[in-house]
Every structure is written in C-alpha cells, then in structure tokens.
C-alpha cells in the first residue's frame, strides 16, 4: 500500500491544496459547527440516530501509530458475541460531531464494527476558531491522514471481534476523498462509500478497483452534480463496480443531523442503501 510522501507525485489536490482554495472557505464554514439552534432538526425529525441502541457498545479508543504516537478514535460494535466485518468511518472535519459516532453506532446496529480514526488529532486543544483549525490542518497532508487511517485498520486487525477479510470505508466530504484514495491504494478495502466526496484527481480515481457507492445531493453547494458524474464516468470506464445516488434537493451534509442541512428522507434512504451495499461486499 502506498502511504508515503511519494504518493503525492501525481497532479491533483492534496490535503494542503484542498484547504487553501475555494474549498477552504467552505470547510471552514463547516468546521465552525456553530449553527442557530432554530435551524437545527428537532429530535422528532431525526430518523437516523441510534446512539442509544442497547444492542450496541461504543466509545472512545486509543491505538498506536507506527509504535510511536497514539491516535484516538471512536469505535462501535454489536454487544452480542461474534466476529463482524470492519468499516472505517472518515469524518470531513472532526469526529466529535455527534453524527460521526452515530455513524459508527449505526454500522454496529447493522452487524459491523465501525471505527472513526481521529485524523484531525493534530488540531491543538486551544484551536477554537475556524481559522485556527484551518491553519493547524494545513500541516497534515493526505499522506498523513492515510497513515492515520491505516493505523486504525491495523488496530482493528488485532481485535478478537473483527472478522478477517476486506474492510469497508465510509467517508464524508474530505473523508469521502480519502475513502476514494483508500480504494485506489489499498488491497484491504473491499467496499467504498463516499458521501459528497471532496476533489479527487482523475488519476487517483482511475486506479480504484473496489466497488464504489456514491451519495450526493442535487443542491450540494460544495460538490456539484457534474463533479459526481465525472467520478462516475472515470470509475465505470475502468470497470470498477459503481453505483451513484443523487438526492433531490439535498445539500452538503444531508446525513448529518447535527446540521441544518439534514434531510431525513434522503438520510434514511442513503443509509439503507449503504448498509445493503456493505453487506453485499463484506459478508
């Protein structure tokens, strides 16, 4: 698996570039996570929250990165005894926004082990403003993030409740881009599910061999439909099994019930499709 700096020799957008252009402004807005409470969905409107499911065990974990530093993450698994396929969850900004732990828990409720590695561990504790967070992120490249994710995969391999075999990956925004990159570079990935993926080079996409299922909204202000169709075209041209689902009127982050863009019907349908896809390719 190519995870070093030499992986960025091709033309395209690495993490540093992605966070310095127009996408940076969008990402800064998304990482602020300070929404008017009146615009957020009410508990009655949230149809995808499963954090209180008594059949799911979940919480923070810490694992080694290259035998040196440690990385934290959020892990969820079924409470029942057994071994279960593993799925990596890649956040677009922070793993503490509740819908990310909830995604892990939803995977566990469906019979998987979900792990969200904290690829944003470089953020200093005192980074409180969007600009401080953006500047801290600039020091962390795509290659760094992929190494963090690989450390998470290695950690999962040591757990007695994780089934041997291929791993799935679900990513959001920048995490969707990283999900595509994993599908391109890792032989361990058997299913890739990007939600409104960030800019990914055509050369990177052209190497993806794993089955891919993409979810995005027709009203996404940061990932236009044309961009999604280009990804679809490139994947299908090389024979990668590909499914693309576009949700009418859905904006960026429509699965995130912690944001005003949450779209319950689209979120529920997208998650049903995601689980079916993962079951098909990981079991």
Model regions and ranges:
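Short beta-strand/loop motif that positions the catalytic acidic residue
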Residues: 214-216
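Short beta-strand element of the alpha/beta-hydrolase
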Residues: 84-91
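Primarily recognizes the serine-hydrolase "nucleophile elbow" in alpha/beta-hydrolase
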Residues: 151-207
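N-terminal twin-arginine translocation
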Residues: 12-20, 27-47
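N-terminal cap/lid segment of alpha/beta-hydrolase-fold proteins
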Residues: 41-79
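N-terminal secretory signal peptides
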Residues: 1-13
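Alpha/beta-hydrolase active-site loop
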Residues: 136-158
């Amino acid at each position: 698996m190519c995870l070093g700096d030499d992986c960025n020799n091709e033309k395209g957008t690495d993490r540093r570039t992605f966070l310095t252009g127009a996408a940076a402004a969008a990402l800064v807005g998304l990482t602020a996570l300070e929404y008017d409470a009146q615009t957020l969905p009410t508990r009655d409107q949230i149809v995808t929250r499963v954090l209180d499911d008594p059949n799911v065990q979940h919480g923070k974990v810490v694992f080694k990165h290259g035998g040196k530093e440690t990385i934290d993450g959020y892990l969820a698994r079924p409470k029942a005894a057994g071994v279960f396929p593993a799925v990596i969850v890649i956040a677009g900004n922070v793993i503490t926004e509740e819908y990310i732990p909830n995604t892990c828990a939803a995977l566990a409720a469906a019979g998987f082990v979900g792990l969200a590695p904290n690829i944003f561990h470089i953020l200093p504790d005192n980074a409180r403003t969007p600009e401080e967070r953006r500047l801290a992120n600039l020091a962390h490249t795509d290659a760094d993030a992929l190494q963090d994710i690989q450390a998470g995969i290695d950690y999962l391999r040591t757990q007695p409740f994780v089934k041997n075999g291929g791993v799935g990956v679900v990513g959001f925004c920048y995490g969707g881009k990283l999900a595509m990159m994993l599908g391109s570079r890792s032989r361990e990935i058997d299913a890739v599910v990007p939600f409104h993926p960030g800019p990914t080079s055509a050369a990177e996409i052209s190497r993806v061999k794993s089955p891919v299922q993409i979810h995005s909204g027709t009203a996404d202000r940061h990932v236009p439909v044309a961009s999604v169709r280009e990804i679809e075209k490139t994947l299908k041209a090389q024979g990668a099994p590909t499914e693309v689902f576009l949700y009418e009127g859905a904006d960026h982050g429509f699965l995130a019930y912690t944001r005003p863009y949450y779209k319950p019907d689209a979120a529920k349908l997208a998650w049903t499709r995601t689980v079916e896809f993962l079951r098909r390719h990981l079991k």
